[in-house]
C-alpha cells in the first residue's frame, strides 16, 4: 500500500486504522528552529475531533496528540517529527454485522478486491479517522507559513445539502459547529441535519478554503503545478468528489473578457483564477472549493452482496456523521497547508537566487 505519503520536501506519512491502537504520522522536512509544542497542534485537532457536536458523530475521542521525536527544548531539530494519537473510544462490535458483507458506497468492496481481505471495523484504513494525523501535520505547516510569510489559511462551509450560505463573516465561523460564516444559515443547517437523522439518511456539503498572502512564484510546472497538487491533496480527503480552483466549473459559462484577471501597475483587477496562473502562485489569495458526497453510512437498509457473492441487505450501525462536511474544514485547511509548505521548500531549493525584473505587483 504505497499511497501513504504526500509531498516531496515537506513529506507527511500517516498510518493507523479507525479501530486500531492509534494513529501515527511522520513529518519530514520541517526546517529546524521552529518553536513547536503539542498545544500548537491541538488547536486544530480540537476543531476536527468527533463527539463535540450533536450534528456530527457521537464517537468521543480526545485526539490528544503526542510529539515523540523531532522537537528538542521546544524547537524543531530538522529531523523527522513523529506524532501519535491513541484511539480510546472504539466500539468494534457495532461492525460485526458487516464482517461478511459490503456497505454500499464505501471502500469495503474495493479494499477486499484489491488486498484480498479488509479491516471491517469502522472502515479500517479507509476511515476518515485517519485525517486526524493530517490535521496535526498540517498544523505544523500552518504555523511555519504564518510565522515566515504571514500566510493565513482558513476555510468555511458554504453549503450543506440544499441549504446555501449567502454571506461570509469570518467572526461567525468559530461560533457554530458548521464552520459557517452566515449566521442566518446556521438554523437552516441545524434543522436539515436534525431532519436527516430522523429520516436515517445523510447529505453532502461544499466548503471553501482560502490561503492569503502566499508569495508569487510557488508551483512546479508542468506536472507539479500548484493547482494540480492542491487538487490531488483535496481529492485524497475522504468523500471529496469535486475540487474547484478560483471560479472553478463556473468558467464553462464565462467569457474571456470577463475572466482574464487584468493587471495594472497597482495590482490585479480580479481573481477569477484563484491565485494561480500557469500552475504558479500569483500572489493573490488562493481560492479552493471542495464538494463532499453524502456519507453512505446511514440507518436506511440497502442492497449489497456478501463474501459468497450472494444478494443481501445491510443496515449500517455505529456512530456516523449525518454530513461529513461538518468536520471537513480543518482537514481541508491542513491539506492546503501541507501542499503550500512543500512548494515553498521546492521553490527555495531551485529559485532562491532568482531576481525578478521588478517587484511583484500588489494582489
Curated annotation (Swiss-Prot):
CDD domains, alphabetized: Chorismate_synthase
UniProt EC number: 4.2.3.5
Database matches in InterPro entries: Chorismate_synth (IPR000453), Chorismate_synth_AroC_sf (IPR035904), Chorismate_synthase_CS (IPR020541)
Cofactor: FMNH2
Pathway named in the protein's UniProt entry: Metabolic intermediate biosynthesis; chorismate biosynthesis; chorismate from D-erythrose 4-phosphate and phosphoenolpyruvate: step 7/7
This protein's UniProt keywords: Amino-acid biosynthesis, Aromatic amino acid biosynthesis, FAD, Flavoprotein, FMN, Lyase, NADP
Record carries keyword NADP: yes
Name of this protein: Chorismate synthase
Native species: Acinetobacter baumannii (strain SDF)
Organism taxonomic ancestry: Bacteria, Pseudomonadati, Pseudomonadota, Gammaproteobacteria, Moraxellales
Amino acid at each position: 500500500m504505497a499511497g501513504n505519503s504526500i509531498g516531496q520536501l515537506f513529506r507527511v506519512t500517516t498510518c493507523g486504522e479507525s479501530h486500531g491502537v492509534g494513529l501515527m504520522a511522520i513529518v519530514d522536512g520541517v526546517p529546524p528552529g521552529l518553536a513547536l509544542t503539542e498545544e500548537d497542534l491541538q488547536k486544530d485537532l480540537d476543531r476536527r475531533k468527533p463527539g463535540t457536536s450533536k450534528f456530527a458523530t457521537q464517537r468521543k475521542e480526545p485526539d490528544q496528540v503526542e510529539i515523540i521525536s523531532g522537537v528538542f527544548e521546544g524547537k524543531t531539530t530538522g529531523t523527522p517529527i513523529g506524532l501519535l494519537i491513541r484511539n480510546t473510544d472504539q466500539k468494534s462490535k457495532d461492525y460485526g454485522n458487516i464482517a461478511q458483507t459490503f456497505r454500499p458506497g464505501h471502500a469495503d468492496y474495493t479494499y477486499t478486491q484489491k488486498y484480498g481481505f479488509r479491516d471491517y471495523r469502522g472502515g479500517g484504513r479507509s476511515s476518515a479517522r485517519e485525517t486526524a494525523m493530517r490535521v496535526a501535520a498540517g498544523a505544523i505547516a500552518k504555523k511555519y507559513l504564518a510565522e515566515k510569510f504571514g500566510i493565513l489559511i482558513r476555510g468555511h462551509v458554504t453549503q450543506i445539502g440544499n441549504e446555501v450560505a449567502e454571506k461570509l463573516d469570518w467572526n461567525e465561523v468559530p461560533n457554530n459547529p458548521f464552520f459557517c460564516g452566515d449566521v442566518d444559515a446556521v438554523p437552516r443547517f441545524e434543522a436539515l441535519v436534525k431532519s436527516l437523522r430522523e429520516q436515517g439518511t445523510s447529505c453532502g456539503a461544499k466548503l471553501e478554503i482560502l490561503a492569503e498572502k502566499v508569495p508569487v512564484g510557488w508551483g512546479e510546472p508542468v506536472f507539479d503545478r500548484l493547482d494540480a497538487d492542491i487538487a490531488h491533496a483535496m481529492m485524497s480527503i475522504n468523500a471529496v468528489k469535486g475540487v474547484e480552483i478560483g471560479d472553478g466549473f463556473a468558467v464553462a459559462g464565462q467569457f474571456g473578457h470577463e475572466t482574464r484577471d487584468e493587471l495594472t501597475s497597482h495590482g490585479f483587477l480580479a481573481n477569477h483564477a484563484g491565485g494561480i496562473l500557469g500552475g504558479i502562485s500569483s500572489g493573490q489569495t488562493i481560492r479552493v472549493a471542495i464538494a463532499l458526497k453524502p456519507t453512505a453510512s446511514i440507518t436506511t437498509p440497502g442492497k449489497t452482496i456478501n463474501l459468497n457473492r450472494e444478494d443481501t441487505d445491510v443496515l449500517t450501525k455505529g456512530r456516523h456523521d449525518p454530513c461529513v462536511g461538518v468536520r471537513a474544514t480543518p482537514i481541508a485547511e491542513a491539506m492546503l497547508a501541507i501542499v503550500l509548505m512543500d512548494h515553498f521548500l521546492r521553490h527555495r531549493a531551485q529559485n532562491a537566487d532568482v531576481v525578478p525584473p521588478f517587484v511583484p505587483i500588489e494582489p
